[in-house]
Swiss-Prot record:
Enzyme class: lyase
SUPFAM superfamilies: Mss4-like
Pathways involved: One-carbon metabolism; formaldehyde degradation; formate from formaldehyde (glutathione route): step 1/3
GO BP, sorted A to Z: formaldehyde catabolic process
Name of protein: Putative glutathione-dependent formaldehyde-activating enzyme
Residues that coordinate or bind Zn(2+) 1: C27, C29, C95, C98
Amino acid sequence: MPVSLHPLVDNGITKGDANFPGGNLYCLCPQNKVTVAIKGNVAHNHACGCSKCWKPAGALFSVVGVVPKENLSVAANADKLEILDKAAAIQRYACKECGTHLFGRIEIDHPFKGLDFVHAELSDKKGWQEPQFAGFVSSIIEQGFHPNGMDEVRSKFQSLGLQTYDTLSPPLMDLIATYTGKKNGKLSANL
């Protein structure tokens, strides 16, 4: 039986709109939905195999991108949100009733502070940036996926035109390393 990576990629990838203006994300409650408004498109959208990201039922991966913190606001039912793990670098805000993760925010000193992590699939609008790569691919093994199936997973991503990484994509890893180099004085702060 073929593996389900994620509903947004299982049957091919739909190209997003570079001029997409944004939209609302909704939790999965049947009524009184938590609504998060996003101005603009996501960036660095990718399939993520980590154990912390929210995944739809049956999917091995989440699809997650980032938006500037100032481009995200909770538009309805903020009282239904809770932080799942206050000690985590990415504080994931989820609906207390349905469990859907609406956004993740970093409040500590971190290379991605100022960016909020979101799942654009929770929107009813089409045009969000399509996935650009697959990250933390090997992490699905830690969650119970048999290691013998990893070649099939990587091949499926590659057939969709997505590179697979066991961390993040090289540009994002370079950003993290640059941040760290500046912080520890090895690189100019003006870089």
